[in-house]
């Protein structure tokens, strides 16, 4: 393998490899930004051509990703990227794929289950890892899939949804108001329906007090001690949420307390773990039923549908659902009541017409 700098100041790599027929072939690739990038690309290419699994998991993921990129819809691929890059690569990325055993998968599963994810989300994440190993067994002769031996986690069907009424939320909020980050954070979650990662990624410039809006265009997670900011899983996740006057004034009050904050600075400089701890504290002090942080999002949806009678397409836009079917399937149990209310209103309209 030869790696040289070209006249543009970029790096070229040239090497020989054996293709799937065992024939020696020459390859020349140009214009890498660094020598390291050129070398790594060549090494991956050689591995791909030889179908040799003596590689790190993250290298095989790139092979799998390149193949699936030709076969999956963009939204499906984006969701896959999101899960693998945030939930799988930090744990398995540097491990040799042939050395990952069922016991390793179970340890990873145990770590996931500690984080309070929903049962359906746990199943979804586990399925993504299993799919990569299935691909390796089918096309690259990996002897067996360690995920099959480890068993699955989570559930394919969601459990009964839990959410707070407005009265329950206000009781809870009263018990965490001693900490500004908790008070204003939970207030924003409840009255916007945003996800916890979206809340944590909000910056000062995302809050427009004059227009009374919040801009959602990114998500925050703390992974292996690092702050990780990623775009939403889907394009619909990028949205502008309109705010009630009450919340605008509350957020203005909160911002006024953040000394020296710059436009690009995060509004809530903490983590999901902090809010999870505060939820436990608040529910114990208030006596309201225990729900997950994500269920506050469901509480907002319930408010929109049951109290305000908002149509599914508007709910989908506000929550950032890619498809209206997601909204309808998630909250189908709330819409029958709305259908009955609609019929009652039609009856009133008919009766008023007859009286005239």
PLM features: what roles do these ranges have?
Residues 163, 220, 248, 319-344:
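Catalytic-site neighborhood detector that most strongly recognizes the C-terminal catalytic loop/helix
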Residues 167, 219-222, 244-289:
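Active-site/catalytic core of tyrosine-dependent DNA strand-transfer enzymes
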Residues 53, 66-144, 158, 271-273, ...:
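N-terminal core-binding DNA-recognition domain of tyrosine site-specific recombinases/integrases
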Residues 211, 224, 230-238, 242-247, ...:
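C-terminal secondary-structure termini that scaffold catalytic or DNA-interacting sites
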Residues 6-12, 16-103, 256-257, 263:
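N-terminal DNA-binding module of tyrosine recombinases/phage integrases
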Residues 120, 138, 187, 191, ...:
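C-terminal catalytic core of tyrosine-transesterase DNA break-rejoin enzymes
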Residues 1-5:
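Short amphipathic beta-strand and strand-loop transition segments with alternating hydrophobic
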Residues 119, 123, 138, 142-202, ...:
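Basic, Lys/Arg- and aromatic-enriched nucleic-acid-binding interface segment
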């Amino acid at each position: 393998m030869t790696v040289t700098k070209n006249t543009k100041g970029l790096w070229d790599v040239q090497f020989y490899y054996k293709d799937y027929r065992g024939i020696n072939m020459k390859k020349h690739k140009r214009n890498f930004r660094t020598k390291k990038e050129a070398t790594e690309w060549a090494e991956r290419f050689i591995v791909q051509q030889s179908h040799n699994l003596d590689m790190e998991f993250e290298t095989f993921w790139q092979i799998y990703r390149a193949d699936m990129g030709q076969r999956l819809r963009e939204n499906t691929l984006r969701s896959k990227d999101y899960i693998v890059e945030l939930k799988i690569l930090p744990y398995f990325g540097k491990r040799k794929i042939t050395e990952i055993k069922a016991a390793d998968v179970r340890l990873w599963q145990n770590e996931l289950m500690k984080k309070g994810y929903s049962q359906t989300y746990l199943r979804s994440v586990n399925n993504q890892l299993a799919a990569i190993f299935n691909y390796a067994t089918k096309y690259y002769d990996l002897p067996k899939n360690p995920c099959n031996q480890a068993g699955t986690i989570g559930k394919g069907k969601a459990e009964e949804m839990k959410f707070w009424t407005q009265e329950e939320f206000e009781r809870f909020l009263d018990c965490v108001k001693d900490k500004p980050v908790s008070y204003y954070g939970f207030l924003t979650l409840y009255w916007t329906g945003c996800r916890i990662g979206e809340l944590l990624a909000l910056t000062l410039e995302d809050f427009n007090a004059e227009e009374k809006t919040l801009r959602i265009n990114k998500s925050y997670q703390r992974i292996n001690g690092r702050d990780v900011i990623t775009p939403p899983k889907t394009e619909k996740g990028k949205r502008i949420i309109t705010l009630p006057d009450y919340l605008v004034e509350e957020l203005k009050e909160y911002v006024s307390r953040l000394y020296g904050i710059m436009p690009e600075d995060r509004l809530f400089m903490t983590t999901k773990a902090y809010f999870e701890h505060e939820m436990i504290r608040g529910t114990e002090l208030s006596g309201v039923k225990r729900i997950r942080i994500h269920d506050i999002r469901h509480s907002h949806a319930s408010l929109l549908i049951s109290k305000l009678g908002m149509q599914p397409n508007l709910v989908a836009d506000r929550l950032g659902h890619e498809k209206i079917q997601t909204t309808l399937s998630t909250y189908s149990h709330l819409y029958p009541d709305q259908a009955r209310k609609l019929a009652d209103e039609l009856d009133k309209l008919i009766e008023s017409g007859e009286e005239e």
